[in-house]
Regions:
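His/acidic metal-ligating clusters that form di-metal
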Residues: 110-191
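Residue-level marker for buried hydrophobic side chains located in beta-strands
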Residues: 6, 30-32, 58-59, 137, ...
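Active-site environment of divalent metal-dependent phosphoester hydrolases
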Residues: 11-15, 38-41, 64-68, 145-146, ...
Length: 254
């Protein structure tokens, strides 16, 4: 058994995916916590590479959710007239969130229905029990677990941006750790400072942000605008940083 990692929100940054692949050993595994495409430089190619990679197990993110709904509408009502599709509700929502290149890449595929089916089957959460016996829950947006077999609705697992504002409840699972993406670390840090401390000096943002008394960790580095991402080792919690030539070492990210 190799090492087990988590990564999230690559958002079409194919170069970061390629660097991760060079780093991985053949027996390693990566949980990809959603948002493979949209906003970046090689959106559909990144989605294809990750989905076709046996070392990656993918969780559905909100950008996959938007893409799937757009695909469904296209297959049902707009194929083969893509011009009309971009005026539809699902199409315009996806485009507004940086999904134009992702959608056009899919439209050019000859096996569009297969890609739709594969993405539509993605889970909204996964679990991993690490070498120290910690139960690691993973979803795109994050959540607070109260029992091992009870989960919030899929919409919340994919889209929620509220759970990180609250402390770890006394009745939540004590042995649990939640790893997630969705909300870039800088927004979580800024919100928590604003709600708990008033005025503050802007901190240097970490690559992996631990909070809720060490029970939660966000690994969304905003790859499409920071040009960096992190692999988090789920057994040792060691962080491995990857960045493109456009990364600014003087930026406020460690």
């Amino acid at each position: 058994m190799g090492k087990v990692y988590a990564c999230s929100d690559l958002h079409g940054m194919l170069e970061l995916y390629k660097q991760i692949k060079e780093f991985l050993q053949p027996e390693d595994k990566v949980y990809m916590l959603g948002d493979m495409g949209d906003r970046g430089t090689d959106c559909w190619e990144t989605v294809k590479a990750i989905m076709n990679d046996p070392q990656f197990e993918v969780i559905k993110g909100n950008h996959e959710d938007m893409l799937i709904k757009a695909m469904k509408d296209y297959l049902r009502a707009f194929d083969p007239d893509p011009d009309l599709f971009f005026y539809s509700r699902s199409g315009s929502l996806l485009i507004h969130n940086g999904g134009m290149d992702t959608m056009k890449g899919w439209m050019a595929e000859s096996n569009k229905a297969k890609w739709f089916n594969d993405l539509n089957k993605l889970p909204t959460h996964l679990e991993y029990k690490n070498k120290d016996g910690k139960i690691i829950f993973m979803s795109h947006a994050g959540f607070t677990p109260y029992a091992e077999d009870e989960f919030p609705p899929d919409e919340e697992l994919i889209w929620d941006r509220n759970h990180y504002l609250y402390a770890w409840p006394h009745d939540a699972l004590e042995n649990a750790i939640v790893i997630h993406g969705h909300t870039p670390i800088e927004y979580i840090v800024d919100d928590q400072h604003r709600f708990t401390r008033g005025s503050y000096e802007l901190p240097k943002y970490p690559l992996a942000y631990w909070y809720a008394d060490g029970h939660k960790c966000c690994i969304d580095n905003g790859a499409f605008f920071t040009n960096c991402t992190v692999l988090l080792d789920l057994d040792t919690f060691e962080e491995h940083k990857f960045y493109t030539k456009d990364y600014d070492p003087e930026a406020i990210w460690d």
